Amino acid sequence: MLLSKYFLPVLKEEPSEAQVTSHKLMLRSGMIRQQAAGIYTWLPLGLKVLKNIENIVRLNMNKAGALEVLMPCIQPAHLWMESGRFDNYGKEMLKFQDRHDNTLLFGPTNEDMITDIFRHNIKSYKDLPKNLYHIQWKFRDEIRPRFGVMRGREFLMKDAYSFDINEENAVKTYNQMYKAYINAFRDLGVFAIPVIADNGPIGGNLSHEFHIIAETGESTIYYDKKFKILKDNPDIDVEEIKSWYAAAEEKYEVNKLPISEQEITSSKGIEVGHIFYIGSKYSVNMNALINDEYGKLTPIEMSSYGIGISRLVAAIIEANCDEKGIIWPSSVAPFKVSLINLNIHDSKCVELAEMAYKELSDKNIEVLYDDTEARPGSKFATHDLIGSPHQIIIGPKKAANNIVELKDRKSGVIEDIEVGSLMSVL
């Protein structure tokens, strides 16, 4: 992509309305623009990151055997009345009437609707297990939306729902999805800790939250110090990770620790995922029954699994930034490479830049080629801000000798590379 053709409205000044780093950087780098309190337009750069995260999550759900569906944003209120949850959300749930005076709502979650879909289409234990997921925009009318997309009113979620014949099978499915979540966060390039948590209004009696460690996190989590090795050793077996202690603040009890208090550390975390074993709460309330192997009608066992796709964008930034801007993990970066031509009027610079651009594009490496008239200092600031993992810098002096500079955004290390070796080094 040529920067001269791209829509990248970067801000030089720090936006006064932003309180946390991720919100400031998302506005400054031209990823989002606010349309109303807690509601944002995703501009091209931000949308690329959002789609990259969405695709990685989708891939891991598919690997876990979940099947993608797409439920509507707008839901009939009678389903929520039937499940007994209509009044639980209060003013957070946006309700309205259509022209026929039917009460509708903008769904904050989908347990009620997926249970309705299940009960009308699955009747026998032979059709189990089933695991359905969708990726859809949600709305909760927060009293005080803040921190940009971290706590907005409109947000993108991946929600999955599993259905099993009994508790034993439901817990097996839950554990499979736990592993899928660990793998998804690994693939996203983030350090997420699974902690024992409350189920909240969703219901149930088994629950884990997944937290990214960040100083701006709103939750305090307590966890075994072993988790710190996950940062440098992401390939540790999931079964081993499951044996390590970690708990949300409301579940942390010093006198009931399975390990010594000295082995525990605490941090602020941003919740980016939550999984629940719900049991038969919804199936009983909504009469979602199936015939078991003895021909007896029995309520289905359910679990619910959520990942905040749009929140993850902000959380990843909070954990991967410096004073210059964002440092994207390669897996979610909008562009893997920023190609910076420092002098677009120098024929050798143009020759090397266009050669590199073609080679990168031919290898399907997403590259943003800065072919603008901007001054070198401005170009450096822009590309440090948007956070491409690698920068190829082409200036007249070194270009004359077929040399370009390759900068690693995270470490800041710059090395001279002969242009013919560029692809192999990358």
Curated annotation (Swiss-Prot):
<comment type="similarity">
    <text>Belongs to the class-II aminoacyl-tRNA synthetase family. ProS type 2 subfamily.</text>
</comment>
<keyword id="KW-0030">Aminoacyl-tRNA synthetase</keyword>
<dbReference type="InterPro" id="IPR002314">
    <property type="entry name" value="aa-tRNA-synt_IIb"/>
</dbReference>
<dbReference type="GO" id="GO:0006433">
    <property type="term" value="P:prolyl-tRNA aminoacylation"/>
</dbReference>
<keyword id="KW-0963">Cytoplasm</keyword>
<dbReference type="Pfam" id="PF00587">
    <property type="entry name" value="tRNA-synt_2b"/>
</dbReference>
<keyword id="KW-0436">Ligase</keyword>
<protein>
    <recommendedName>
        <fullName>Proline--tRNA ligase</fullName>
        <ecNumber>6.1.1.15</ecNumber>
    </recommendedName>
</protein>
<dbReference type="InterPro" id="IPR004154">
    <property type="entry name" value="Anticodon-bd"/>
</dbReference>
<dbReference type="InterPro" id="IPR002316">
    <property type="entry name" value="Pro-tRNA-ligase_IIa"/>
</dbReference>
<keyword id="KW-0547">Nucleotide-binding</keyword>
<keyword id="KW-0067">ATP-binding</keyword>
<dbReference type="InterPro" id="IPR050062">
    <property type="entry name" value="Pro-tRNA_synthetase"/>
</dbReference>
<dbReference type="InterPro" id="IPR006195">
    <property type="entry name" value="aa-tRNA-synth_II"/>
</dbReference>
<dbReference type="Pfam" id="PF03129">
    <property type="entry name" value="HGTP_anticodon"/>
</dbReference>
<dbReference type="InterPro" id="IPR023716">
    <property type="entry name" value="Prolyl-tRNA_ligase_IIa_type2"/>
</dbReference>
<dbReference type="InterPro" id="IPR044140">
    <property type="entry name" value="ProRS_anticodon_short"/>
</dbReference>
<dbReference type="InterPro" id="IPR004500">
    <property type="entry name" value="Pro-tRNA-synth_IIa_bac-type"/>
</dbReference>
<dbReference type="GO" id="GO:0004827">
    <property type="term" value="F:proline-tRNA ligase activity"/>
</dbReference>
<dbReference type="InterPro" id="IPR045864">
    <property type="entry name" value="aa-tRNA-synth_II/BPL/LPL"/>
</dbReference>
<keyword id="KW-0648">Protein biosynthesis</keyword>
<dbReference type="InterPro" id="IPR036621">
    <property type="entry name" value="Anticodon-bd_dom_sf"/>
</dbReference>
<dbReference type="InterPro" id="IPR033730">
    <property type="entry name" value="ProRS_core_prok"/>
</dbReference>
<dbReference type="GO" id="GO:0005524">
    <property type="term" value="F:ATP binding"/>
</dbReference>
<comment type="function">
    <text>Catalyzes the attachment of proline to tRNA(Pro) in a two-step reaction: proline is first activated by ATP to form Pro-AMP and then transferred to the acceptor end of tRNA(Pro).</text>
</comment>
<comment type="subunit">
    <text>Homodimer.</text>
</comment>
<dbReference type="GO" id="GO:0005829">
    <property type="term" value="C:cytosol"/>
</dbReference>
